[in-house]
Each structure stands twice: as structure tokens, then as C-alpha cells.
Amino acid sequence: MMRQGTSPSKLYLPKIKDAPLTIFEYVCKKFHHIGTEVWQKRFNDGLVKDLDGRVLDLNSPYQHGMTITYYRHLCDEVVVPFEHHIIYEDQTLLVVDKPHFLMVSPAGDYVQQTLLTRLKQTTGNPHLSPAHRLDKDTAGLMIFTKTCESRCAYQSLFNDRQINKIYHAIAPMTQAHQFPLQVLLPLVRGEPFYTMAVGAGEPNTHTDIDILAVSEDGKLAKYELKPTTGKLHQLRVHLNYLGIPIAHDSFYPKVIHRAKDDFDKPLQLLAKHLSFIDPITNKPMAFESGFELDFSKV
């Protein structure tokens, strides 16, 4: 059952040595970073239940093999003042244009202000699930599956690289490289941990890059990016590696911390086009984002 557009999280209670007396004690230790007062409020508000829907309280005993469900406490979130747009829907698919600054799925400090929660609220469908990733800072096309039965088929398209993806990005114009070109790099986790870096060894990422347009003053270019792999931050790292970091990138070449309500400088990266053969109907599908990147906004 959904609550304000969010589905409950599930937690299995394992058999452990020196098990706590209560479920409350266990979750407080397991999720110590959350805070005892937060869990106390969840129990007091009736947000923690067993799989049969029975409400658990602070004194409910710990029983290994049991599965509990709980809703994250919805704190006051910074409202993302940009709207998504549904551009296609059928019995199994929902294709959406995601604005900049909006996370796809709940994580960290974001629950309500995510695309998935918004869609669950407006459609009433608790089975919606993203078929792939898209950074919070990136705008453009997102595919969601509408049924549990279809989820694996569409996620496999991305995992098996059966999707044609085209991105647009605005970055400095350069004479140091001749376009079109290919970038093949080995990417690894960077420092801080939420960034990526160029490592050693065989390349595990591949992007074809070309120039679509140049600004009137010749300082900026709009690049067309065609990744054949889908590593985290791949396009951002590839352009930064070429010495042309994407405009308004707060991670590359260096991390810049911005306030959560700072919406002035969106990352100039857009998931513009997706095409594939539908695994259910075997029909060719192609979608284009209605958003555009504009030199005047940089």
C-alpha cells in the first residue's frame, strides 16, 4: 500500500548472535545513522508493520525470520520547482521527460521530491519502476515499467546494451581535438566516493562524440554524445577528460557544494533520444525529449 506516493521498504530480521529483545532496538542499531528519535516516531505513527499489515510498536519482540515493512519519515524537503512531462504511455511503458534537479528514485534526503514518487501519486500505480538510471542533475528521457511482469524485459535492454541513446551537452569549444571522435576509458570510483575517475587497465566505457553547433562567439559548442556503455557519470568524465567539462558541472573537474535550493545553474546535459525494439511487442520504438539546451542559459 502506498503512502503519499511511496511504497514501504522491507526488512528481513536475520538469526543473529545476542539478538535484541525488540525490533525497535534492532533497527536503531542497524540504522544508527538515522537516529533513535526518528525510529521512535515511525513506530508511534504506526508506520512499522509486519507482512500481514499488523502495526508493530516499540515493545514488539524481535523474531528472526520475520519481515517487517516501514515507511521513511517524510521530512520537509526542498521543493524542486520544475515539472516532468509524460510523452508516451501504453500498457507496459511510461516514458517521461525529467527536468534538471529532480532525482529519479527516493534516496538520502529525497522522498517526495523524486520523479518516481510524483508519478506514483499522479498515476496511482504502486508497481511503477525505473528501467534505467539518470542523474539528478541530468534532464531528459526516462523509461518506467508499469507492471512487475514487464520490468525485467525492459531493464535487460539497458543491461544488454540494446538501447540506442543520444545525449546533448554544452561545453567549451575546443580546437585540441578533431571531431567526430571516440573516447574509451577505464572508469573507477573516485574520491569523494560519489564521483568517478579514470583508472588503469582495459577501457570499460565508450562514447562517440561529435559537434552539433557552435555559439556565435565561438566559445561554446553543443556536443552530441552516443554512449554504448552506461557507467555512472560516464559522459561527464569523458568530456572532462578531453578538457571540455560540461557547463555547470558541480563534480568535474572539481566538486563544488551548492545549496539544495540553488536551481540557477543546471548541468547542461540532456538525454535527448532513445530508440529500441520493444521486447514485448517486437516493434521499433523511438522517443525524443521536448527539452532543449540553449547557449544563452550558460
Predicted regions and their residues:
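RNA pseudouridine synthases
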Residues: 1-298
